A protein has these predicted regions:
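Beta-strand elements of well-folded, non-transmembrane domains
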Residues: 41-43, 142-144, 164
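Acidic surface patches and DE-rich sequence motifs
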Residues: 87-88, 118, 126, 204
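Exposed beta-sheet edge/beta-hairpin loop segments within beta-rich domains
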Residues: 115-136, 143-153
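OB-fold/S1-family single-stranded nucleic acid-binding modules
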Residues: 147-167
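OB-fold ssDNA-binding interfaces and closely related basic DNA-contact patches used
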Residues: 1-105
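Short, basic/aromatic beta-hairpin or loop at an interaction surface
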Residues: 105-119
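Acidic, gly/ser/pro-rich intrinsically disordered tails
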Residues: 1-5, 167-211
């Protein structure tokens, strides 16, 4: 398996959520930490969806001839879900950002950190440039698995290329400018103003009220 294989897909422009590209993350306590991100592919991008469908079918055939010992399950769990439907984990609707998208999560082990590049293809230096809500191209690999007697198709995370910024999704830490506004130039105290002293009440810098 690898680049050039039909199971390997590079998406069109997609939105990223739950971005953990530089530091591995465990979604549940005690679980294995992995690099990962959730990928939102617009349903209007039928070309990417067709490549994904073909990759999943090819991965099923690899499973039949390999790990699945010649038998394909009647229903094969796949990682791609309808963002207009409900989450398979809890039956609740996907978030509003998923509407009109195909949704899937790709991950890779701590031994294989994904290569992350900027719009020019250069290694991403500023890690804050990749956040939940950014738009990117993502290379993924679909593969068959058999774990604990369960068979299915998984999705491995490969290189990621930022395309453009987008509105940060919930769960992303706001910047200082977003939280407090653009900083204003420091103003000098008026001529003759009484300097701060221990006898004066402290003022809350956010509300302007005495503390």
């Amino acid at each position: 398996m690898g680049f050039g294989d039909i199971t390997n897909v590079t998406t069109g422009e997609a939105r990223l959520s739950y971005v953990h590209l530089f530091k591995p993350y465990a979604h549940q306590p005690g679980a294995e930490e992995k690099f990962s991100c959730t990928i939102l592919v617009p349903k209007s991008d039928t070309a990417t969806k067709a490549r994904i469908d073909a990759a999943i079918e090819a991965a099923k055939q690899k499973g039949i001839s390999g790990k699945w010992n010649g038998v394909c399950p009647p229903i094969v769990p796949t990682p791609v879900h309808d963002g207009d439907g409900v989450r398979p984990s809890d039956g609740m609707p996907f978030g509003p950002e998923c509407k009109g998208h195909w949704v899937f999560t790709a991950n890779t082990s701590v031994d294989y950190p994904p290569e992350v590049v900027d719009q020019n293809g250069n290694p991403m230096i500023n890690q804050s440039e990749m956040y939940s809500g950014v738009y990117a191209l993502v290379n993924v690999e679909f593969f068959p698995y058999m774990f604990g007697g369960k068979k299915g198709i998984g999705c491995s995370l490969g290189p990621v290329k930022k395309v453009r910024d987008g509105e940060a999704l919930g769960g992303s830490a706001p910047t200082a400018a977003q939280a407090f506004g653009v900083p204003q130039p420091a103003q000098q105290p008026a001529q003759g103003a009484t300097p701060w002293g221990p006898g004066q009440p402290a003022v809350n810098p956010i509300t302007g009220l005495p503390m």
